[in-house]
Amino acid sequence: MQARRLMMSNTMNYMKAATACIDLVALQHNLQLIKQQAPHSKLMAVVKANGYGHGLRHVAKHAVGADAFGVARIEEALQLRACGVVKPILLLEGFYSSGDLPVLVTNNIQTVVHCEEQLRDLENAELETPVVVWLKIDSGMHRLGVRPEQYQAFVERLHQCPNVAKPLRYMSHFGCADEMNNEMTPKQIELFLSLTRGCKGERSLAASAGLLAWQESQLEWVRPGIIMYGVSPFGDKTASELGYKPVMTLKSHLIAVRDVKAGESVGYGATWISERDTKVGVIAIGYGDGYPRTAPNGTPVLVNGRKVPIAGRVSMDMLTVDLGPDATDHVGDEAILWGADLPAEDVAQHIGTIAYELVTKLTSRVEMSYSE
C-alpha cells in the first residue's frame, strides 16, 4: 500500500508534454454572440467529433445558451444523455440501421432522414413512441438529402407514418456558405425556402458560415459548429476579427535549446538547412499528439510570446523551431502551437489545411485542461 501511494505521489505532479487549455468562459462568450447575431433563431450547438476536439461533456455542460445539441453519431448522443443532458439531441447523419430506432426512442433522440432506406425502416418499425424527424433536403450540395423531385413524396409518406412525431421538421446544408461571391448559396436558400414555404414544422438551414454571412438563412433554428469554438469558417478572416474568442490554446514547452551552425541540417530528411549560426528549440509535441506532420518549414509557433518558424520535419514526439542567433529561451519555457495570440486559422493556412482539422485531430496523449 505504501509503495502504491508513493507511485501515485510521484506521478501526480509530472509535467505533461502537451496540453490543450479549454477556456469555457470564451465558449459562453461565443454562444452569447451567436444569439445576438441570430436573435430570432433557436440555437442547436453542434458538438460532434468530441465537441470539435474540445471535450464533448465539458462543452455540453457549459453551453448553457444552447437550446439543443447536434451530433453525428449515436454514441455521441448517448454520451450526452449519460452525463445528464436533457435538452433535445439531433443525429445529423440520421440513424444507420433499423436496430438504432429503439435506442432513439428510449433516449429521446431526434433523427435526420435523408434517404429511402431510412424512410422504409421507419415505416416498418414497431416503436413504442414516435420519433422526432428532420427531413434533410438536398438543396445543391449533393452529399446527403432527398432531391427536390423526391421531396413531396417523402413528405407525404412521413406524414402518414405513425412512427414519426408531428409536425415534421426540415433542414438542409450549404456547400459554399464561406464563399461570399459564390452563387450556389443564394440558389440553395431560394430552393429550400420555396420547398418548405407553408410547412408547419420548424426549419434549419444555417450552420456557422450561414448564420454569420447569410442572414436570410437564419430560420427557426441555426446550427453553429466551428464558430462556437472561436474558429472562423471563413478563409479570409479569423474568429477574433469577427469578435469571437478562441476556446482552445494548445501548449507545450522547450525540452532542448541547441546551437546549430550555418550549413547544418535539422530533423528527418534534412529538409531544413540553417543559413546562419542560430539556436534551435526542440518542443515536446509531434504528430503522435495530432500536430500535423505536413507542417512545412516556416509554420509559426509562439515561444515566450514571440513568433518563431518551424525548422525541419515534424516528428512523432517533437518539432523544432529556429529561435534565432540571439535567443535567450531556456528549457521548460512555454510554446504555444495555436490559441488566442496565434489563431488556429493562421497555422492551418501555413500547413495547407483548415482549422477544423487541427482542433479535431488531437490525440489522447494531449492533456485536456479546463478553466471556467
UniProtKB/Swiss-Prot annotation:
Cofactor(s) recorded in Swiss-Prot or TrEMBL: pyridoxal 5'-phosphate
Gene Ontology biological process terms in this record: D-alanine biosynthetic process
Active-site residues, record numbering mapped to chain: 48 (proton acceptor), 268 (proton acceptor)
Pathway given in the UniProt record: Amino-acid biosynthesis; D-alanine biosynthesis; D-alanine from L-alanine: step 1/1
SMART domains attached to this UniProt entry: Ala_racemase_C
Gene3D superfamilies the UniProt entry points to: Alanine racemase, Lyase, Ornithine Decarboxylase, Chain A, domain 1
Cysteine pairs bridged by disulfides in the record: none
Catalyses which reaction(s): L-alanine = D-alanine
GO molecular function: alanine racemase activity; pyridoxal phosphate binding
Residues that bear N6-(pyridoxal phosphate)lysine: 48
Protein's UniProt name: Alanine racemase
Source organism: Vibrio vulnificus (strain YJ016)
Taxonomic classification: Bacteria, Pseudomonadati, Pseudomonadota, Gammaproteobacteria, Vibrionales
Gene encoding the protein: alr
